[in-house]
Each structure stands twice: as C-alpha cells, then as structure tokens.
C-alpha cells in the first residue's frame, strides 16, 4: 500500500484509519444513517448495514465504490458561510427515494459531525414536520458527536421558519 500523506490535516496515522474504513454508523431512523468518510470507505460494513445509497457532503471525496452503491456528491466545505440550504431539496429527494426503495442511505461528510448532520436534520424537519430543536435532539440522541457549525445551525433555524410559513 502507498504511504498515506496527511491529506486531511489529521496526521498520517489518522488519515490511514479514515481511508481504511470504520464502523461508527449512527442509525437516525430506519434506513437513514450518519457516518464519516471512514464508514463510507468500508464496503463490507455498508453492505451488511443494508446501505444502497451514499450521500457525500464534502469536497475531494470521490465515490470509492461506484459499481456497488448509488452516490450523490455535494461538494461543500464545513464553514459557517457555506450555504447548505440550496442543497436541502435535492438531498431530501435523494434520501427519501433511497428509503422508499427499501434501501438504506449513508449521509456522510468528513467526520460525520457538521455537514452530514445538517442535511439529516433538514430532512427530518421536512419529512416529519419537526422543529429544529426536536430534530437536532433526535439526531444527537443517536449520534453524540453531532455538532453542526454555527452557520449551519442558523440555516436550520431559518429553514424551520420557512417550513412553518408553508404549513
């Protein structure tokens, strides 16, 4: 195997672990999982978890198994000024179609803490008519490391207002 360089700014050893695959999936509801790039790189674990679709919310992470899973990639960075709201509808559709087809969907970013959590919280809010606090509480109860950045939290709070306005 080639030497792993510190591409992700987490040290060579941690970069190696992330690329080899992890097993820290959090099932938020039936068929909907949050994880990190480590889980996205663990083909056998994804298959054993009935994952059929993978939604990547990160830059520079090409789908590792395009012949085995249906992928959607949203290339965004984890910064407060990044506008994730423009992707909420297409992510909602991707997640919902995966679940409706009887499969499972992994939503992941790099660490499974901010971008992926934001997308899943937005999905829950729209799908189940949940408020931001209730959806965030549900996600955190199943994934303790769920901490969207302050900009994403603000976007989710605004999204809640827009959903309530359409009700």
Swiss-Prot record:
The active site is at 109 (phosphocysteine intermediate). The gene is DSPTP1B. It catalyses: O-phospho-L-tyrosyl-[protein] + H2O = L-tyrosyl-[protein] + phosphate; O-phospho-L-seryl-[protein] + H2O = L-seryl-[protein] + phosphate; O-phospho-L-threonyl-[protein] + H2O = L-threonyl-[protein] + phosphate. Belongs to the protein-tyrosine phosphatase family. Non-receptor class dual specificity subfamily. Disruption phenotype: Delayed wilting symptoms in response to Ralstonia solanacearum and, by contrast, acceleration of disease progression during Botrytis cinerea infection, suggesting that this phosphatase plays differential functions in biotrophic versus necrotrophic pathogen-induced responses. Prolonged MPK3 and MPK6 activation during ozone treatment. It comes from Arabidopsis thaliana (Mouse-ear cress). Keywords: Cytoplasm, Hydrolase, Hypersensitive response elicitation, Nucleus, Protein phosphatase. It is found in: Nucleus; Cytoplasm. Associates with MPK3 and MPK6. Interacts with MPK6 is promoted during HR-like responses triggered by fungal elicitors, whereas interaction with MPK3 in repressed. This is Dual specificity protein phosphatase 1B. Induction: Accumulates in response to stress conditions caused by abscisic acid (ABA) or salt treatment. GO terms for molecular function: MAP kinase phosphatase activity; protein serine/threonine phosphatase activity; protein tyrosine phosphatase activity.
